Regions:
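Conserved catalytic micro-motifs used in adenylation/nucleotidyl-transfer and phosphoryl/amide-
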Residues: 1-5, 11
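A short local loop/turn or secondary-structure capping micro-motif enriched for an aromatic residue
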Residues: 1-2, 18-21, 77
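Short loop segments at secondary-structure junctions
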Residues: 6-8, 119-121
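Residue-level structural signal for beta-strand termini and adjacent loop
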Residues: 7, 14-15, 83
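Conserved, helical-rich catalytic subdomain that frames metal- and/or nucleotide-binding sites
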Residues: 14-63
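Conserved beta-strand-loop-short alpha-helix elements that form
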Residues: 41-50, 60-86, 100-102, 106, ...
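ATP/nucleoside-binding phosphotransfer catalytic cores, i.e., glycine-rich phosphate-binding loops
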Residues: 92-93
Length: 121
């Protein structure tokens, strides 16, 4: 999940994957993570284990916030700066389509799922 607020894109959740853990530990760079052979090996997912260890974060909503929920089909193909530029330039309905188009333009072969939620006053 990402939060677009005041012209900046913030990653709220962290990938619960082998590569995500390596990245957080400083063992690899973001560039290495993008093409790492284990980038799709997940360490926790709903429905795979009897017990989960969810990470819960509370964030106060602010009018104008845009929440982005998306699959790695988007984030593997588009950089945060590109995603932020689309969110800055388009209304949410158009931005969702534009983000899918952006991922496909960059050669995306994975499924691309995008959900945008705009916080109103």
């Amino acid at each position: 999940a990402y939060l677009y607020r005041d012209g900046k894109l913030h990653q709220i959740t962290e990938d619960q994957s082998m590569v995500g853990e390596m990245l957080r530990a400083g063992a690899i760079t973001e560039e290495q993570a993008r093409s790492h052979p284990y980038r799709n090996v997940i360490t926790q997912a709903v429905g795979t284990e009897e017990r989960l260890s969810p990470v819960v974060t509370r964030i106060l909503k602010t009018p104008g916030d845009i929440w982005l929920l998306c699959s790695d089909g988007l984030t593997d193909m588009a950089r945060d700066e590109e995603i932020a530029a689309v969110l800055a330039d388009c209304q949410p309905a158009a931005a969702a389509e534009e983000l899918v188009h952006l991922a496909l333009q960059h050669g995306g072969t994975d499924n691309v799922s995008v959900l945008l939620l705009e916080v109103k006053a």
